[in-house]
């Protein structure tokens, strides 16, 4: 990981201005209602469930969520099916942060998670195969200009809580709140240390 956040692609390319983000969203809101746009929150839950099913660390899941949000910050929800983009982001994040999740495990996990946890929204089988995910990965990498480094609020949060001297009491709750921030646009709008500081 790059040693300096202020010189990283995360800061230089992916801390977005709120007005620019809203302007990009207006394209979608011409065709989708605000409620339909909440699908972004729903799919962060899908990514979380998929990562948990694969037993990935929370940082890998958070990275996948950031990749997902970056893609849909620049492209419409109609450009690529979020059902395909969610496991693609998990796959790419696992490669970047953890080590490759096998093709069969990823497809089996996506099928299982959609069938068991989200069957109310997806009554059919998971329609994609690994070749679709690998093709989608190219689109994702192209959009992000291969800038895969993501800084997270976890490390600064840990430092802030340690400085306060109340680790046992504060850290579990603060960690869960950080996880919940990934359902919002905060990871696109603010540096991670600011998110951690606000939570602390």
Give names to the regions the model predicted.
Residues 1-59:
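A eukaryotic "domain-start" boundary segment
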Residues 35-198:
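Structured all-alpha helical bundle cores of eukaryotic regulatory proteins
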